[in-house]
Regions:
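A conserved short coil-to-beta-strand element within the FAD-binding core of flavoproteins
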Residues: 128-141
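N-terminal Rossmann-like FAD-binding beta1-loop-alpha1 element of flavoenzymes
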Residues: 2-29
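Hydrophobic aliphatic residue packing
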Residues: 4-7, 27, 111, 123-124, ...
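Short glycine-/acidic-enriched loop or helix-start segments at secondary-structure transitions
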Residues: 16, 39, 137
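Conserved N-terminal/central alpha/beta ligand/cofactor-binding core
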Residues: 32-125
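Phosphate-coordination loops involved in phosphoryl transfer and adenosine-cofactor binding
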Residues: 1, 96, 129
Length: 142
């Protein structure tokens, strides 16, 4: 088992911690704030626009300016994978005008709670009020 340290408890940090823990790693998140997902809480006017339900070709045509750069990321974990992740974790979602995907509850806090629950179930350790100022490699590794 490897130890994985993640700097920042936003949406990306929480997702990274879940997938790292699912792969059998000991995971720690270092978050400078008092809670996780602080910016996620305010997205979509507090409703949290989780993703877009359009097909991937439409997504690339309308959102991405450098398709080759983003191709592997978008196809490595698609918008449907995001929807499946949340529904499998117990958060029902709905699709609204413009193919925008929101939690059925219309509360971004439910998205954060779902991520936190997954992290807790996987044993992810969170260190609040922790600012990382420097990362140093020793003997060729971090």
């Amino acid at each position: 088992m490897s130890k994985v340290l993640i700097i920042g408890g936003g949406a990306a940090g929480m997702f990274a911690s879940i997938f790292a823990a699912r792969n059998g790693n000991e995971v720690h998140i270092f978050e400078k704030n008092e809670k996780l997902g602080k910016k996620l809480f305010i997205t979509g006017k507090g409703r949290c626009n989780i993703t877009n339900a359009c097909d991937m070709d439409t997504l690339f045509a309308n959102v991405v300016t450098n398709e080759k750069f983003m191709y592997s990321s978008f196809y490595g974990f698609t918008n449907q994978d995001v929807v499946d992740f949340f529904e499998n974790a117990g958060l029902p979602v709905k699709i609204e005008r413009g193919n925008r995907v929101f939690p059925q509850s219309d509360h971004s806090s439910d998205v954060i709670k779902t991520l936190e629950k997954e992290m807790k179930n996987l044993g992810v350790q969170v260190h609040f009020y922790t600012t990382v100022k420097n990362v140093v490699a020793e003997n060729g590794s971090f």
